[in-house]
Structures are given as C-alpha cells and as structure tokens.
Amino acid sequence: MSLQICILTPDRVFWNQEAEEIILPTNTGQMGVLTNHAPIITALDIGIMSIRTQKDWTSVALMGGFALVKQNQVTVLVNSAESKETINSSEAEQAFLEAKEQLEKALGQKEKVEANFAFKRARARYQLVS
C-alpha cells in the first residue's frame, strides 16, 4: 500500500503520483508521513518537501501552505512549488546571498519580516539545487 500525493498550486497540479513516504516542512519542524498515518491538517512553512517513491527520493521546494493527510491520501495546497530542474543554481545562490545580506541589514519590524520571508524562500530554492 502507498500514499497518493497531490501537490496543488494556484495555477496547476504540480505533482499527482504515488509515494511510499513523504517529509513535510511544517511550521513546527519536519513531519514524516507513512501509509496509514492518522488524519491531520497542518500548516506548511517555506522549505523542502521530500518524497520517496519506490525508486528514489525527490525533493520539491514549497513556498508555504497547508497539507491534509487522510486515508492514505495527502493533499498539499501551496502558494508555489518548484522542482530542481526548473531552478538555475547560480541564480539561486546569488538570490540566497542577497537575501541573507538584506536580512542582516533589516532595521524596522516590517523590513525584518519581509527580509525573513525573502530569505526563507531563497534558502529553500538554494538548498534544493545544492
């Protein structure tokens, strides 16, 4: 028995396949899901989702959202999702370094929140390709 994984973004179905295991980036840390997991709804943070199929592991950068686990079906609703193949590694590294610098320079509360969001997004994309 396996999990049916569906990753949805506002504009498309990003992933709709079976998997043996997933690891989700929740707001309270990483959460693993195997078959017959208890039903749960959880908020997702910006980060890397790992998916284990019968053959290998695949990673996807998620940009925040929610996940519903119920009866071996996992529905992931996210603002955006990216695969390794769609990200330019040098651009991702440059964006990560710039976001890190902006986070260090941020002064006001609003600036810090915006810089932290940009940093987390850039870090997820960079981690995916490195």
Curated annotation (Swiss-Prot):
Q: Localized where?
A: Plastid, Chloroplast thylakoid membrane
Instruction: Kindly list the residue ranges recorded as spanning the membrane.
Output: none
- SS bond list: none
- Domain of life the protein comes from: Eukaryota
> Cellular component terms, GO, for this chain's entry?
chloroplast thylakoid membrane; proton-transporting ATP synthase complex
Q: Which UniProt keywords apply?
A: ATP synthesis, CF(1), Chloroplast, Hydrogen ion transport, Ion transport, Membrane, Plastid, Thylakoid, Transport
Any Pfam family matching the protein: ATP-synt_DE
What does the record say about its membrane topology? Answer: Peripheral membrane protein
Question: Which InterPro entries would you find in this protein's record?
Answer: ATP_synth_F1_dsu/esu, ATP_synth_F1_dsu/esu_N, ATP_synth_F1_esu_C, ATPsynth_dsu/esu_N
Gene Ontology molecular functions: ATP binding; proton-transporting ATP synthase activity, rotational mechanism
Function field: Produces ATP from ADP in the presence of a proton gradient across the membrane.
HAMAP family in alphabetical order:
ATP_synth_epsil_bac (MF_00530)
Q: Member of which family?
A: Belongs to the ATPase epsilon chain family.
**What binding partners and quaternary form does the record give?**
F-type ATPases have 2 components, CF(1) - the catalytic core - and CF(0) - the membrane proton channel. CF(1) has five subunits: alpha(3), beta(3), gamma(1), delta(1), epsilon(1). CF(0) has three main subunits: a, b and c.
| This protein's name | ATP synthase epsilon chain, chloroplastic
The protein's organism comes out as Tupiella akineta (Green alga)
* Lineage of origin: Eukaryota, Viridiplantae, Chlorophyta, Ulvophyceae, OUU clade
